Every structure is written in structure tokens, then in C-alpha cells.
Amino acid sequence: MDSLLMKQRKFLYHFKNVRWAKGRHETYLCYVVKRRDSATSFSLDFGHLRNKSGCHVELLFLRYISDWDLDPGRCYRVTWFTSWSPCYDCARHVADFLRGYPNLSLRIFAARLYFCEDRKAEPEGLRRLHRAGVQIAIMTFKDYFYCWNTFVENREKTFKAWEGLHENSVRLSRQLRRILLPLYEVDDLRDAFRTLGL
């Protein structure tokens, strides 16, 4: 586990949603864990992690939360803000993990979409997460602002958007929507059949 707050430069470098993210070989994951009790929720923990040699950050988080004694009678919501979306293998592990914890929900807000050489694997991993009930979205100004005020040693400086933040968020959101679109269409079809009583 890293220190509780990130340095400003590290956050801006790793989370910047630039089109070409050369040299950004680490993945950072900021997280919030909440327990939901009826209409209210309680923050249990927050912090950030980064990948370690030989272990992706998503798997580090799964190891971390596996050590908790999660009460099966309570609902938990985990929110991740990641510098890269999960690779296929991590997506598979996360989906499998969530199957064992039906009382835990996960939301992922990614700064950038990760694709390696096999451009079909990572999109399939994102679809697998979506099928497992994970809410996946691209970070917007609001998410960066929240992260800046929650996870960054900001010395009371206000978060300032960089040039292209909004445009890149829109572009990446469209790309993510195209990846998940077949699943949305199936969901829409199911809802239509349900409405018709079929």
C-alpha cells in the first residue's frame, strides 16, 4: 500500500487522458470502499495503489480486500479511478472475484483505455466486466476534480483542467460505448421483451 495521498505531479502525469500516453507503464488505482446500510453509506477506506513488478494493480486490490472480513449480510460498493482500464486477464480475475461476492458492487472510472497487441482481448475483457455487473466509464472533469480533492496532496490548490481533457474524455467515452454497445443492445432487447411480457 502506498502513502495515502499522491503527489500532484504523479497524479497529473499518470492520469492525464492524453491520446498518446508514452512512457506511462505503471497503472495507478485510487479506491473508495463504502458499506451501504439502507439509504445511507459509510466510507470504510480509501487510498491508492500502483502496480508492482509482476503484479497488476487490480490484482493487488483484490488481494487487499480479500483480507477483509466482509459481512455477507451487508452490501459494499467499491469505486476505482484508474489511470488505465484493466487488461483482459485482470478483467477476468475481477469478474471471477465478484462472482464470489454478490454483496459487493464495483464501479470503474478509467482515465484511458488499455489495449496491447491483441486488440480483441481487452475489449472482450471490458465486456466481461460489464456482464459481471461492473459499471465502467471514462473519467470526466468531475471525476478528476473528485480525485484531486480526495487522493492528491494538493496543498489546497484547485484542480485545473488541461487542454483537451473534455475532448479526450468524450472521444474515449464514445470508444468505450462502441466496445460495450453489443451488450447494451442485448440489455435493451431484454427490457423490451420484459415490457411486452415475453
Curated annotation (Swiss-Prot):
So what does this one do?
A: Single-stranded DNA-specific cytidine deaminase. Involved in somatic hypermutation (SHM), gene conversion, and class-switch recombination (CSR) in B-lymphocytes by deaminating C to U during transcription of Ig-variable (V) and Ig-switch (S) region DNA. Required for several crucial steps of B-cell terminal differentiation necessary for efficient antibody responses. May also play a role in the epigenetic regulation of gene expression by participating in DNA demethylation.
**UniProt-listed GO biological process terms:** cytidine deamination; cytidine to uridine editing; defense response to virus; DNA cytosine deamination; mRNA processing; negative regulation of single stranded viral RNA replication via double stranded DNA intermediate; positive regulation of gene expression via chromosomal CpG island demethylation; somatic hypermutation of immunoglobulin genes
Gene name for this UniProt entry: AICDA
Q: Where is this motif: Nuclear export signal?
A: 183-198
Q: Which reaction does it catalyse?
A: a 2'-deoxycytidine in single-stranded DNA + H2O + H(+) = a 2'-deoxyuridine in single-stranded DNA + NH4(+)
InterPro entries linked to this entry = APOBEC/CMP_deaminase_Zn-bd, APOBEC_Cyt_Deaminase, CMP_dCMP_dom, Cytidine_deaminase-like
Q: Which residues form the CMP/dCMP-type deaminase domain?
A: 23-129
- Consult the record and explain the modifications the protein receives after translation: Ser-38 is the major site whereas Thr-27 is the minor site of phosphorylation. Phosphorylation regulates its class-switch recombination activity.
GO molecular function of the protein, one example? cytidine deaminase activity
Gene3D superfamilies per record: Cytidine Deaminase, domain 2 (3.40.140.10)
In this chain, where does the modification Phosphoserine occur?
38
Region Interaction with SUPT6H: start-end pairs: 2-26
* Catalytic residues identified in the record: 58
Quote the subcellular location field of this record: Nucleus; Cytoplasm
Pfam families, sorted: NAD1
Please tell me in which tissues this protein is expressed.
Expressed in thymus, lung, spleen, kidney, small intestine, lymph node and tonsil.
* Region called Required for interaction with RNF126, residue ranges: 88-116
Q: Where is this region: Important for interaction with CTNNBL1?
A: 39-42
Name the family the entry cites: Belongs to the cytidine and deoxycytidylate deaminase family.
Bipartite nuclear localization signal, short sequence motif: residues: 1-30
Any Gene Ontology CC annotation: P-body
EC annotation?
A: 3.5.4.38
Q: What is this protein called?
A: Single-stranded DNA cytosine deaminase
Keywords, ordered alphabetically: Cytoplasm, Hydrolase, Metal-binding, mRNA processing, Nucleus, Phosphoprotein, Ubl conjugation, Zinc
